[in-house]
Amino acid sequence: KNEFIRF
């Protein structure tokens, strides 16, 4: 899981 784009 990639949690980079969290807006």
Curated annotation (Swiss-Prot):
Modified-residue entries (Phenylalanine amide), positions: F7
Top-rank lineage group of the source organism: Eukaryota
Tissue specificity as recorded in UniProt: Found in the nerve cords and a variety of ganglia particularly in the anterior regions.
Annotated keywords: Amidation, Neuropeptide, Secreted
Cellular component terms per the entry's GO annotation: extracellular region
Keyword Cell cycle assigned: no
Principal place of residence: secreted
Function: Potent modulator of inhibitory motorneurons. Reduces the input resistance and blocks slow oscillatory potentials in these cells.
Family: Belongs to the FARP (FMRFamide related peptide) family.
Name the UniProt record assigns to this protein: FMRFamide-like neuropeptide AF1
Organism whose genome encodes this protein: Ascaris suum (Pig roundworm)
Classification of source organism: Eukaryota, Metazoa, Ecdysozoa, Nematoda, Chromadorea
